[in-house]
Amino acid sequence: MVTATGIAPGSEMTAQMEQVEERNVSGVLHIASIFASHMVLQRNKPIAVFGALAADCAGMEVVAEIHDFDGSLIAQEHAYSSQNVVNGFSQWRVMLPAQPEGGPYTLRIVAGNDAIEFDDVLIGEVWLAGGQSNMELELRNSEHADQALEDCADPLLRFYNVPKTGVINRNAENTSSWQESSPENSGVMSSVAYYFARKLRSELDSDLPVGIVDCYIGGTSISCWMSEDALNSSDAGRDYLTRYQRAIAGKTQQQFELETSEWESQVDEWNANVAAAREADSDIAQEKLNEQFGACPWPPPLTPTSQWRPCGPFHAMLERIMPYSLAGFLWYQGEEDEQYCGFYRELLGMMIGEWRALWSESLPFLIVQLPQWIDKKVDEGDGDPMLWPVLREAQWDAAQSIDNVFAICTMDCGEYNNI
């Protein structure tokens, strides 16, 4: 079913591609894809384990257990799946008792005659890193990347990349995994989140595992990470929904596909030109590239399945991993909302409240403020230099007015004309 903001929550309309083997399925038992061998679970608070059962098993008991390396039982709890069946599944959630840091352990989930086990499970600190391209910048593309990757091997630092999508993509979820930090793996990790995790590893106990859940998409507005109910609760949120609905009104599926295909071709051509230019001159400036090839084609066309539409990633990414037990959130986003910066303070507060409600606790929320940066069009007098200061003020105000929210100033970290 398609709603005003795209695919309806829980809809069976999912990303279409060649099917791959289901990773977290055994008979009637389904477990959320964020659970995998090598994962890090949150210490010192109840551990949420969740998934679904086939419809004819509604009300069945589900048991979750943590076992030590020698097979001895460390923790066990059970729950019953919901009697309500949605899209052929009955949801369940088991809350294991809080555990101190440690591992490696085995997490075992049983429903009737079906069971799934995950090995090499650690318990430590787990943070979710969210936002747009600021957070998405991969370690391999960051400054001093070669040295960082050479030094990144750490079996107690692990990460999980939530598949980037605007519509539930089970194939991508089935191929996703928790990975140890290593030169082979960590290049695709968020650079900001990696250095944050490294700091935790160095400042906290030396044997404390740290896990990062990467959940971001470049170019996303804050509205992409909120629900329809949240956006509809304020004039600011409704404004985003109205603009999106106007953008897709009257268009057919064929038009959506054509617009997307044309845009993807333009981006592919631009990327190829830029790659060739950088191959010829590794020091070529972005300004020179823009003069030769124009700016990267942006924004992408909006469609009912777009990952840049309001609420899309909220349903297809964030809801797919909640309420995986966390220590807190790390948020780095804002520039996509510069034209509507007057709304940002209200929406940021609403988003923080909604995320905390999903996790049922007032988790710490660390907001990375936008850095110093001046767009060339502003430098040339064709833009408003005060948009980003408004966003920074909104981020700072949220930290001053909402409990357990903190702003991280990066004014001295940006470059004059390159964010």
Identify the role of each PLM range:
Residues V2-I419:
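Cell-envelope and extracellular/periplasmic
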